[in-house]
């Protein structure tokens, strides 16, 4: 939706997600010192394949996005904090309107849209692949865009 609306010059995402079953519950030895830390007690920075995966699904974005992940002590639900440099100037109102329209039309049932002050637990059992959070949209100097 963003690429169709304003074009994406480049971008960076931080995926924040629940720890996974292969992480230890207590600090332990591991070749990756981050991965050896207690999953239920720490926010753990790690790598992500999400940026590369987007390039596979949307070839026009291949090589334009990079990112990192942070695993957090929650049982489920993830969030993506995406920042892009838009190819043209925009504002919060335009971004939110496009995302709302997409959630009601071409991405109905796939993309959710909310303006409620929801946190991760509120999305348990939500059937949408992703939910756009209206009050988290920020635009700086017209082209630096941040969405969640």
Descriptions of predicted regions:
Residues 9-10, 15-144:
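C-terminal substrate-binding/catalytic lobe of Rossmann-fold NAD(P)-dependent oxidoreductases
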């Amino acid at each position: 939706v963003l690429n169709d609306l304003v074009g994406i010059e480049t971008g960076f995402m931080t995926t924040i997600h629940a720890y996974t079953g292969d992480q230890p519950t207590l600090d332990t030895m591991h070749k990756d010192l981050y991965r050896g830390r207690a999953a239920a007690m720490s926010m753990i920075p790690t790598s992500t394949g999400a940026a590369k995966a987007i390039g596979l699904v949307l070839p026009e974005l291949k090589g334009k996005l990079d990112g990192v992940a942070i695993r957090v002590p929650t049982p489920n639900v993830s969030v993506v904090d995406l920042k892009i440099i838009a190819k043209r100037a925009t504002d919060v109102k335009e971004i939110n309107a496009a995302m709302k329209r997409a959630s009601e039309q071409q991405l109905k049932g796939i993309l959710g849209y909310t303006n409620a002050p929801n946190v991760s637990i509120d999305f348990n059992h939500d059937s949408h692949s992703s939910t756009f959070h209206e009050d988290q949209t920020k635009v700086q100097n017209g082209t630096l865009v941040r969405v969640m």
